[in-house]
Swiss-Prot record:
One of the protein's GO biological processes: regulation of DNA-templated transcription
Protein name: Probable transcriptional regulatory protein Bpro_1967
Chain spans, region Disordered: 1-22
One annotated Gene Ontology cellular component of this protein: cytosol
The organism's taxonomic lineage, starting at the top: Bacteria, Pseudomonadati, Pseudomonadota, Betaproteobacteria, Burkholderiales
Compartmental location: Cytoplasm
The entry's keywords: Cytoplasm, DNA-binding, Transcription, Transcription regulation
Disulphide bridges, residue numbers: none
HAMAP family documented for this protein: Transcrip_reg_TACO1
Length: 243
């Protein structure tokens, strides 16, 4: 099943994360703390915490930092309490954007998100204005050249919903968010290591943006991602700035 180009967007995202490791660590630490506060500090019974710890390992965060974050969240140490908030809006060409944040000050966060939208050509919407265009699911991305047949066989057997081969050769596995961990483990046990593995909000349909609109949209997304309280930015824009 063919789809739109995927690999360049993944590499852009990974490149920005590599450039800003400390910011990535901060975001992962917030996720660890919220996951541990909501579900407890036991990795064996808290799948959200397990996923957060996996992200910490992928970001090369020291194990002591992870333990410290769990301890703060579960009451062993004093710490800041974060809450999760979601903002929705629009970018260029009517593209939909979701900004998930963790904050200790909602007033500050909403002001920063609204300013980023308005200054860079987008605008904020109301709650629920764009979220219906996305599906909460597990997503695993494999590099071009990975065996499509092997990925498909293992993933579907383990409970994946779909396997998509994109035009650039990247392979995308979609799972129910509740089955993400089981599918990921099955693929890794078969020697198939994804370049990206996460529970995400995946757009049902993409909006193609080219040229100046694509460049402006990328700038808006980058600014939103760089806000201190941002955890994740999801959108439905397929960007091609080459024209």
């Amino acid at each position: 099943m063919a789809g739109h180009s995927k690999w360049a967007n993944i590499q852009h995202r990974k490149g920005r994360q590599d450039e800003k490791r400390q910011r990535v660590w901060t975001r992962v630490m917030r996720e660890i703390m919220v996951a541990a506060r909501m579900g407890g500090g036991d990795l064996g019974t808290n799948p959200r915490l397990r996923l957060a710890v996996d992200k910490a390992k992928a970001a090369n965060m020291p194990a002591d930092n992870v333990k410290y974050g769990i301890a703060k969240a579960t009451g062993s140490l004093e710490g800041v309490h974060y809450e999760e908030v979601r903002y929705e809006g629009y970018g260029f060409g009517g593209a939909a954007i979701i900004v998930d944040c963790m904050t200790d000050n909602r007033v500050r966060t909403v002001a920063e998100v609204r300013h980023a939208f308005s200054k860079h050509g987008g605008h904020m919407g109301t709650e629920g204005s764009v979220a219906f265009q996305f599906k909460h699911c597990g997503q695993l991305i494999f590099a071009p050249g990975t065996s499509e047949d092997k990925v498909m066989e293992v993933a579907l057997e383990a409970g994946a919903d779909d396997v998509i081969t994109h035009d650039d050769g990247a392979i995308e596995v979609l799972t129910p968010y509740t089955d993400f961990e089981a599918v990921k483990k099955a693929l890794e046990a078969a020697g198939l290591k994804p370049e990206l593995a996460e529970v995400t909000m995946r757009a049902d349909n993409m909006i193609e943006l080219t040229g100046e609109d694509a460049r402006k949209m990328q700038k808006l997304l980058d600014v939103l991602e760089d806000l201190d309280d941002t955890q994740e930015v999801f959108h439905n824009a397929a960007l091609d700035a080459s024209e």
